[in-house]
Amino acid sequence: QKKAGRETKEGIIGSYVHTNNKIGVLIEVNTESDFVARNDEFKELVKNLTLQITAADPRWVDKESVPEETLAQEREIYKEQFKNKPPAVIDKILEGKMQDFYKANVLLEQTFIRDEEITVKEYIESKIGKLGENIKVKRFVKYELGE
């Protein structure tokens, strides 16, 4: 059975409060066993994800979490910006703009801040390979004082 299809019912809640005490992040990261959840490498992954969220400010975990209404609004904005272009060109531009939107707003699609050669998704996949269990980011929340 592929790791990606296996259930993740264990895990930890990670937290990070920025040194200025004005930004805090909570994240739930799940894995298949308590054994992996207690592993230092897994804990490091969770810590790195909280730092990623603090620095890069994603709004959603994965592409599937982005509301269809938000995607439709983004597409309309881009279509309006490029309405004088031929339809085939608009489609290509739209595709690129939506990829940029995902990279800016979706945690798993973002460039990993500790290694800009890979995405957060690729970083997690590398840890799945090392730890031998499926790992899923379930949810996160970022708090900013005054926001």
Regions found by a protein language model. Give the residues of each.
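N-terminal assembly/interaction segments in proteins that build large macromolecular machines
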Residues: 1-147
